[in-house]
Amino acid sequence: MSLEEKKKTESKEKDKALSLVLGQIERNFGRGSIMRLGDASRMKVETISTGALTLDLALGGGYPKGRVVEVYGPESSGKTTLTLHAIAEVQKNGGVAAFVDAEHALDPVYAASLGVDVENLLVSQPDTGEMALEIVDQLIRSSAVDLVVVDSVAALTPRAEIEGEMGDHVIGSQARLMSQAMRKITGNIGKSGCTVIFLNQLRLKIGVTYGNPETTTGGNALKFYASVRLDIRRIQTLKRGTEEYGIRAKVKVAKNKVAPPFRIAEFDILFGKGISTTGCLLDLAEETNIIIRRGAWYSYEGENIGQGRDNTIIWLDQNLEIRNKVESMVKEKLTEGTEVSSNSMKALNSNPANTIAVNDIKTVA
């Protein structure tokens, strides 16, 4: 037998042994317990829209289904608003969403104004961190819930801390709780297809001279288990004269296992109304040269449609036929591969200020 024939025989034997062991594993542990990475049907990740077109682009489609997502940032930066929009999107598509309100601060009126069906929203206000995470785990295992939001990790107080006295040192109890919960949750989350979004607060590390002193609460487990981590910041207050009517938010995709990370998205959050979808559309239409800005004036197909960004947004909202036409043109250009700031890393590389400065952030308790 020649050397080439010997290699072919060995290769056939290996293929046969591999198919046998794969079949045995699937019989023992179920279909999908082991797979080839090139299996296209398994590689495709379904997503949930964030409610902001620019952020959907930065994430590669939206929040991935069957994954853990962490959203963190300073106070009043738009974390809860972001998740309420995700809940509204899930409900629009006939899905079921749950909100685990560990902070006991959910405003049903505000949620309804963002499009959330509060009548059918599952809400839990747990007494302890253990109770909250057990509820999350049971909702995931039911396979009947599409999205679970936990607001927030910082408010998941361990039972030992609640039952103890003020001033008692229970070092690392919350980190241990989160570590145990993540090990338990991630085993079930992929099978159920449920997305879990954890909101988190920022703290400052004591004595850090070099590097970023910011850190999130609850230890490091969530950082490792999360497929997507979003850093949301308030970069501007929107005003009409002296009246404040919203904020400009910047979201950096700090981690993404299902699409390229480190992309940046910006959008407006209007008080009482949530994310300005028309504002996102105008930004993208300007970047793709569908709407042209010259000075303060915006024009569409050679005709001026508004002086200033706010007036142009109002005009688009009043002329829905043209707005829908602009939206379809923007989506067509993006499908063709047109690069904009939300799906590019150029903005990040050219602007070191995107590692947003620390200001007005809660210090370590």
From Swiss-Prot:
GO biological process: DNA recombination; DNA repair; SOS response
Compartments it resides in: Cytoplasm
InterPro entries registered for this protein in UniProt: AAA+_ATPase, DNA_recomb/repair_RecA, DNA_recomb/repair_RecA_CS, P-loop_NTPase, RecA-like_C, RecA-like_N, RecA_ATP-bd, RecA_C_sf
SMART domains cross-referenced by the UniProt entry: AAA
Positions contributing to ATP binding: G73, P74, E75, S76, S77, G78, K79, T80
MF terms in GO: ATP binding; ATP hydrolysis activity; ATP-dependent DNA damage sensor activity; damaged DNA binding; single-stranded DNA binding
GO cellular component: cytosol
Keyword Metal-binding: no
Keywords linked to the UniProt accession: ATP-binding, Cytoplasm, DNA damage, DNA recombination, DNA repair, DNA-binding, Nucleotide-binding, SOS response
SUPFAM superfamilies: P-loop containing nucleoside triphosphate hydrolases, RecA protein, C-terminal domain
Keyword Zinc part of the UniProt annotation: no
Gene3D superfamilies the UniProt entry points to: P-loop containing nucleotide triphosphate hydrolases (3.40.50.300)
Pfam families: RecA, RecA_C
CDD domains named among the record's database cross-references: RecA
Function recorded in the entry: Can catalyze the hydrolysis of ATP in the presence of single-stranded DNA, the ATP-dependent uptake of single-stranded DNA by duplex DNA, and the ATP-dependent hybridization of homologous single-stranded DNAs. It interacts with LexA causing its activation and leading to its autocatalytic cleavage.
Family: Belongs to the RecA family.
Name under which the protein is recorded: Protein RecA
Species assigned in the record: Prochlorococcus marinus (strain AS9601)
Encoding gene, per UniProt annotation: recA
